[in-house]
C-alpha cells in the first residue's frame, strides 16, 4: 500500500495500491446512478417461506445484511403472492439500494450492492432507494464500498434532514459525490474489502458456534449433575435493592454503577460498561460485592424478567434501581462464579418464568422466587462445570477480539481508500 496522506495531490485517497498513480474522478452520484421506483410493503406483507419475488426491506439494510448481498445465499423474504405489485423493477447484478431513513445520521443512506442475482427476482422495498450504474463507470463490487466510505457518509450527515428520524431522497444525490478510479483499481479495492467481509462473516460463525456449544454444554452438564443439592435462594443468602432516591441530576459523574443493560446482556458484569452516579458522604446505598448475583426486576416481556449476571470484580460499585442483587452467604453449598452460567441455563429460565407477573409490563415476584426450591450440582461439580465453561468463554472473548480487529481494519480502509 502507498500512503499519500502527506502528499499535495488532488483527488487521490490517502491509501492505495502502489501500482496505481493516476488521479480519481469525482462523480456526482445523480450522474452515476439512474434511480427506479420502490414499493412500500411492510413486514406483514412479506413471507420468508413462500413466494416468487423477494423483497429488500430497509430494516435488513440497517441490520442483518452485509455490504455485498449475495442473492443466491443471503436470506431475503418473499412478497406474499396476493399482494405482488403490478409494476416493479427487478435488481440487476451490481445494483445498489440505500436505506433512506434512520434515527442515526451515520446510518442514513446506508447501502448494499446486489451480487449473484441471476435467476433471482428481487425488488427494492420500503424506505429504500434503488440505483443502477447505466453509465458503465464502475465494476461489480466497488459501489457498495464507495457508498460505505467515510467520505460519502460525511456528505450525507451534512444534508440528512429531520430531528428524531433523519432521511434522504433521490434529489439529495445531486449534492453528493464519490471517487471513481480506473476499473482495475476499483476491482482490486473491491477484492480486498470483499475478502475482509468474508473473514468477518467467518469470524461471526466461529463465535456463534462457540456460543451454541457453551449453551448446549451448560444444559447438558446441569442435566447430568444438577440434582445433588436441593435448596433455595433464601437459604443461600440474602437479597438487596439497587439505587434509591436518585434523580436525573445525580447521574453522569461520581461512583460507578452497573446498568440494567449490563446485567441483561452479560453473564458476568462487564466492568468496561459502568455508568456513574453521585453518592453523597454518609448516604446509605447497597454496594455490590464480588460474587453477587444480579437480576433484572421487570420487562415488557416475561421472558426478559429475572435475567441474571454475576459480578466478579473488586471495585466498589452500585446497582441500578431496576435490578436487585443477591449475596451468597452459604459458600459450602454454592460457588458464586458458577451462577454466571446457572442463571442462563434453560432449566433455570424455565424455573423463573412463572414468577414474572403482569399484563402490559411484567415484574418478578421476588419473595416467591427466593423461597422456591432449586436444585444445584455439588459444590465440587459447580467448580468443575464453571472451569469447563469458563475456558470456552475465554475462547469466545479471544475470537471476539479478533472480530473487532477485522472490523476496525475494514473501517480504517473505508476511511483511507476512498475520496
Over which residues does each language-model region extend?
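A short glycine-rich beta-alpha junction/loop motif
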Residues: 6-13, 121-129, 138, 150-153, ...
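Sequence-specific dsDNA recognition surfaces
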Residues: 30-46, 60-96, 234-247, 261-293
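Non-catalytic DNA-recognition/assembly elements of restriction-modification systems
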Residues: 12-40, 221-244, 371
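Structural detector for helix-capping/boundary residues
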Residues: 15, 27-30, 59, 150, ...
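Amphipathic alpha-helical segments with low aromatic content
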Residues: 1-25, 175-176, 181-227, 380-419
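Short, ligand-facing micro-motifs at secondary-structure edges
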Residues: 62-77, 96-125, 141-145, 154-157, ...
Amino acid at each position: 500500500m502507498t500512503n499519500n496522506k502527506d502528499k499535495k495531490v488532488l483527488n487521490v485517497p490517502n491509501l492505495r495500491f502502489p501500482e496505481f498513480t493516476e488521479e480519481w474522478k469525482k462523480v456526482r452520484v445523480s450522474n452515476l446512478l439512474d434511480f427506479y421506483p420502490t414499493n412500500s410493503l411492510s413486514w406483514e406483507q412479506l413471507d420468508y417461506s413462500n413466494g416468487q419475488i423477494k423483497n429488500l426491506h430497509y430494516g435488513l439494510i440497517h441490520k442483518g445484511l452485509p455490504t455485498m448481498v449475495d442473492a443466491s445465499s443471503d436470506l431475503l423474504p418473499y412478497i406474499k403472492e396476493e399482494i405482488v405489485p403490478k409494476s416493479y423493477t427487478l435488481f440487476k447484478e451490481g445494483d445498489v439500494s440505500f436505506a433512506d431513513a434512520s434515527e442515526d445520521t451515520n446510518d442514513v443512506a446506508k447501502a448494499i450492492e446486489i451480487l449473484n442475482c441471476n435467476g433471482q427476482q428481487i425488488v427494492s422495498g420500503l424506505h429504500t432507494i434503488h440505483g443502477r450504474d447505466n453509465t458503465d463507470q464502475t465494476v461489480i463490487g466497488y459501489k457498495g464500498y464507495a457508498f460505505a466510505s467515510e467520505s460519502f457518509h460525511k456528505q450525507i450527515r451534512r444534508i440528512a434532514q429531520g430531528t428524531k428520524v433523519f432521511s434522504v431522497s433521490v434529489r439529495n444525490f445531486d449534492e453528493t459525490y464519490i471517487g471513481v478510479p480506473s476499473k482495475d483499481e476499483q476491482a482490486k479495492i473491491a477484492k480486498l474489502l470483499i475478502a475482509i467481509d468474508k473473514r468477518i462473516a467467518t469470524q461471526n460463525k466461529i463465535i456463534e458456534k462457540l456460543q451454541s456449544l457453551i449453551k448446549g454444554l451448560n444444559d447438558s452438564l446441569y442435566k447430568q449433575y444438577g440434582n445433588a443439592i436441593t435448596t433455595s435462594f433464601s437459604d443461600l443468602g440474602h437479597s438487596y435493592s439497587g439505587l434509591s432516591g436518585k434523580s436525573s441530576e445525580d447521574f453522569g459523574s461520581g461512583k460507578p454503577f452497573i446498568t440494567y443493560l449490563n446485567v441483561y446482556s452479560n453473564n458476568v458484569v462487564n466492568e468496561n460498561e459502568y455508568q456513574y452516579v453521585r453518592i453523597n458522604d454518609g448516604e446509605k446505598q447497597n454496594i455490590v460485592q464480588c460474587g453477587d448475583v444480579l437480576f433484572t426486576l421487570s420487562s415488557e416481556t416475561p421472558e426478559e424478567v429475572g435475567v441474571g449476571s454475576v459480578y466478579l470484580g473488586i471495585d466498589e460499585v452500585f446497582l441500578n434501581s431496576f435490578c436487585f442483587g443477591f449475596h451468597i452467604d452459604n459458600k459450602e453449598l454454592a460457588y458464586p462464579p458458577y451462577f454466571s452460567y446457572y442463571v442462563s441455563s434453560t432449566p433455570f429460565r424455565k424455573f423463573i418464568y412463572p414468577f414474572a407477573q403482569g399484563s402490559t409490563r411484567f415484574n418478578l415476584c421476588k419473595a416467591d422466587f427466593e423461597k422456591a426450591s432449586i436444585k444445584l450440582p455439588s459444590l465440587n461439580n459447580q467448580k468443575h462445570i464453571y472451569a469447563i465453561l469458563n475456558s470456552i468463554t475465554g475462547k469466545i472473548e479471544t475470537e471476539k477480539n479478533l472480530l473487532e480487529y477485522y472490523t476496525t481494519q475494514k473501517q480504517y480502509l473505508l476511511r483511507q481508500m476512498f475520496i
